Amino acid sequence: WIMGHMVNSIAQIDEFVNLGANSIETDVSFDKQANPEYMYHGTPCDCGRDCLHWENFNDFLKGLRKATTPGDSKYHEKLILVVFDLKTGSLYDNQAYDAGTKLAKNLLEHYWNNGNNGGRAYIVLSIPNLNHYKLIAGFKDTLKNEGHEDLLEKVGHDFSGNDDIPDVEKAYKNAGVTGHVWQSDGITNCLPRGLSRVKLAIANRDSGSGIINKVYYWTVDKRSTTRNSLDAGVDGIMTNYPGVIADVLSESAYKNKYKIATYEDNPWETFKP
């Protein structure tokens, strides 16, 4: 999965997919009542990027729905996964459940079109704080209560705080999550970061007894870091330059080992070579 980083306006969806991304990450900010409000990152952000692109949350969902609904004039067949980077740092811990509820209601209406030929992309809810694990229950309970439990098949999870893997596992246990787990590791492209925790996450993924199904590394803009990540065995790479990742994947060392994921590739299944 080539994951376009910080895609916060509708115009950027086309831009990043056209550059080679089959997945995008977008930043969700919340208001004081725990309503998802804007797609917005703000400053500081990655080196070499404009941090100020933004869109109203529900408008973005509608644009995203068009981009992922077959037959729509804006449809991109290869856009198959969307990571919602949930900026819950502005919320109190006791608002996490409400945030999940409100997120689910908005996605149900504006992205899934109330279950009537909505967008088809897989969704990863990425939470920065382990203490906010109740967001997951709020989200799941709401879809169940609204009669759309089937849509949970399209939803996965990530804790993005670079926490120790055993602590992440504990948070999932508290949340009642047993699958659909992506594990992120990384740092802004302005700073270097080693691969030691990525390798721990990959070991958990491949152990057969861990909770992790997929591992992605962010934010990777250089060919050398891309190669190191692929050598370690990641499933996804988040980048500001999708073309760089696509180029490296076409190199002789990688083109027979990796392929660019399509809709038929189940993002919740641990890959067994």
Swiss-Prot record:
Residues at the catalytic site: 5, 41 (nucleophile)
SUPFAM superfamilies referenced in this protein's UniProt entry, alphabetically: PLC-like phosphodiesterases
Tissues showing expression: Expressed by the venom gland.
Reactions accelerated catalytically: an N-(acyl)-sphingosylphosphocholine = an N-(acyl)-sphingosyl-1,3-cyclic phosphate + choline; an N-(acyl)-sphingosylphosphoethanolamine = an N-(acyl)-sphingosyl-1,3-cyclic phosphate + ethanolamine; a 1-acyl-sn-glycero-3-phosphocholine = a 1-acyl-sn-glycero-2,3-cyclic phosphate + choline; a 1-acyl-sn-glycero-3-phosphoethanolamine = a 1-acyl-sn-glycero-2,3-cyclic phosphate + ethanolamine
Positions annotated to bind Mg(2+): 25, 27, 85
Cofactor(s) for this UniProt protein: Mg(2+)
EC number per UniProt: 4.6.1.-
Role this protein plays: Dermonecrotic toxins cleave the phosphodiester linkage between the phosphate and headgroup of certain phospholipids (sphingolipid and lysolipid substrates), forming an alcohol (often choline) and a cyclic phosphate. This toxin acts on sphingomyelin (SM). It may also act on ceramide phosphoethanolamine (CPE), lysophosphatidylcholine (LPC) and lysophosphatidylethanolamine (LPE), but not on lysophosphatidylserine (LPS), and lysophosphatidylglycerol (LPG). It acts by transphosphatidylation, releasing exclusively cyclic phosphate products as second products.
Protein's name in the database: Dermonecrotic toxin LruSicTox-alphaIC1b
Organism: Loxosceles rufescens
